[in-house]
Design a protein with these regions (language model features):
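Metalloprotease/metallohydrolase-associated module, dominated by Zn2+-dependent proteases
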Residues: 56-165
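Membrane-embedded alpha-helical segments that form the functional core of polytopic membrane enzymes
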Residues: 10-24
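Short, charged juxtamembrane terminal tails flanking transmembrane helices
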Residues: 2-3, 161-170
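Start-transfer (signal-anchor) and selected internal transmembrane alpha helices
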Residues: 1-13
Length: 170
């Protein structure tokens, strides 16, 4: 079997990371809904327009819409546990995956879900407890830009792992 080149590893990582992101993002929203029901709330998953902050345009996003407010503590659980629970199957796969490209793509998506867990819970805490509105946390540019940077980092890592020169000593 021939060794994968850096460019091949980069393309494979890009493809796998994006495919995993789509699945992880959908799972993340389903987990929000599951936790919402588990804490006694009701709601649904909707596709809604999301206004961009830097451009005069909307993009569309999946979102869990509660039928009624569930209170701060329960909403905090919903916000944090949605992405955290979505990361569990990826973490299990990461434990068993041996191929470097697969591991890098899984790590990137676990990191992305951790990012979502932190900003979704953090934004709620900042607004509710401290009355601090960091509106950047809720912009599409931030919510998709940071994960895009994480994906680019994964691609660079995969490329770098396959282009390093190993010098024998001894």
């Amino acid at each position: 079997m021939r060794k994968t080149t850096g460019m091949e590893a980069a393309w494979r990582t890009l493809l796998l990371t994006v495919l995993l992101f789509v699945a992880a993002f959908g799972t993340h929203e389903v987990m929000h809904l599951l936790v919402l029901y588990a804490v006694g709330g009701h709601g649904s998953i909707v596709v809604r327009p999301w206004r961009m902050g830097l451009f005069d345009a909307d993009i569309y996003a999946l979102h869990v819409q509660p039928d009624q407010p569930v209170g701060l503590d329960r909403q905090l659980l919903v916000n944090f546990l949605g992405p955290a629970l979505a990361a569990v199957p990826l973490g299990a796969l990461l434990f068993y995956a041996r191929e470097p490209v697969v591991r890098v793509a899984l790590w990137a998506n676990v990191a992305i879900l951790a990012f979502y867990a932190i900003i979704e819970a953090g934004d709620l805490i900042l607004e509710s407890a401290y009355e601090i509105d960091l509106s950047i946390l809720t912009t599409p540019e931030f919510n998709y830009g940071v994960p895009a940077l994480m994906m680019l980092t994964a691609i660079f890592v995969a490329w770098r792992q396959n282009t390093e020169v190993h010098v024998a000593t001894g």
